[in-house]
Amino acid sequence: VSFTGNVLALDVATVTGWAYGSPGSVPTFGSIRFGKPGGSRAAAYRAFSKWLEKEWNVRDAQPDLIVYESPAVPSIMSGKTNIDTIRLLIGLVEYLEGWCYENFELREATVSQVRAHFLGRNMKSAIAKPMTMARCVELGWKVTNTDEADACALWDYQCRFLRPDLASKTAPIFSKALIR
């Protein structure tokens, strides 16, 4: 049986990118900030929980599946993150897991899996971020920041597994943006 529902992809962070739609469609997407820079984790958690309830626990917009990007492992970040950021990211994801429990199917994907799918190979963030944005624009997804672009790439990655018959149009082999 082919998947015919809607997928919500979340690049969970202080500024969370999201993408939503069914495989084969053009996703809707956006980004939202949870908390002020330097603000409390508790405030960010509360803002995240309110957003999930308001935007995604509504009958017309409920996803059939939610996929999120794994929080970055500190050793991979090469000292570019701190303990507060790690706690925030893990806390947001833990909240998401609890919120989805017995309500929504939840899946997880790593950054390297998504980049290999969407860009044809995994590469460092400084190279991958602008390429991901360019790839989204090439596909007609007018993203305005890297959070939205990462969420769209994650959405496309998950849709490929759900409906491989619809994935060829976004396969990196057909990308002009990736030919260099």
Q: Where are the language model's segments positioned?
A:
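Phosphate- and other anionic-substrate recognition elements at nucleic-acid/protein interfaces
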Residues: 1-180
